[in-house]
């Protein structure tokens, strides 16, 4: 992008659209201009991929609205928002089974019975991980797919916490916290990482206690699929 040479977002988009691409990938949406460009590209019928820096998936919708994009455009052009965090993996060379404390689980909105049969792990520290107990990273995701319930909430200008409640109660959104619990229960990451990276987000905890039984069953089923529960 070089405005002095007339290489602007709008001009570049016109040239890209003329090439009839299947997917348009844009850089980070930081301001109203880049947001409008992304929306205009989506209005041409093309699939547009871009990025935000937000706390969670609902934050992406809020960011577009705060950039003064028309509500009806946000509701009609956005198909999905994916939030992710990177959590450290326990070192495979020194990881050992760990039984999480009742207090640690309850601080995350869970009871021991919700994760019965899971295989939590924690690295003890070794030369291969430089005595950190961790090696590599794994992503936890929150995938918000817009349907008629969410589009209606956006058009009716519901506040962010109401949009998030709708996404959880009516659309079955699995939050970053819940996805992290499933991965921790399968030894992919640790509860310490979950608390450090994810659970500090207040919005990540909305309604999590209400859904802990359902997620607990999902954890146990995933463990069965992996052959960890006989």
What are the language-model segments listed below?
Residues 219-230:
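Positively charged, low-complexity/disordered segments
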Residues 1-217:
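Short, flexible helix-loop junctions that flank or precede catalytic/ligand sites
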């Amino acid at each position: 992008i070089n405005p002095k040479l007339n290489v602007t977002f709008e001009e570049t988009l016109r040239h890209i659209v003329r090439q009839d691409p299947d997917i348009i990938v844009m850089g980070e949406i930081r301001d109203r201009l880049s947001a409008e460009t992304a929306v205009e590209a989506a209005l041409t019928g093309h699939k547009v991929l871009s990025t935000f820096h937000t706390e969670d998936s609902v934050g992406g919708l809020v960011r577009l609205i705060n950039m003064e994009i028309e509500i009806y455009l946000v509701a009609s052009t956005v198909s999905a928002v994916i939030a992710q965090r990177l959590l450290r993996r326990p070192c495979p060379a020194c990881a050992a089974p760990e039984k999480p404390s009742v207090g640690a689980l309850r601080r995350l909105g869970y009871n021991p019975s919700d994760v019965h049969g899971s295989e939590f792990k924690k690295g003890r520290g070794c030369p291969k991980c430089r005595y950190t107990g961790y090696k590599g990273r794994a992503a936890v995701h929150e995938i918000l797919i817009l349907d008629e319930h969410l589009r209606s909430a956006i058009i009716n200008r519901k506040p962010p916490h109401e949009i998030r409640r709708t996404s959880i109660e009516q659309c079955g959104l699995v939050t970053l916290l819940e996805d992290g619990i499933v991965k921790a229960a399968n030894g992919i990451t640790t509860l310490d990482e979950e608390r450090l990276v994810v659970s500090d987000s207040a919005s990540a905890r909305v309604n999590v206690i209400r859904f802990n039984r359902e997620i607990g069953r999902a954890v146990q089923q995933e463990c069965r699929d992996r052959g960890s529960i006989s």
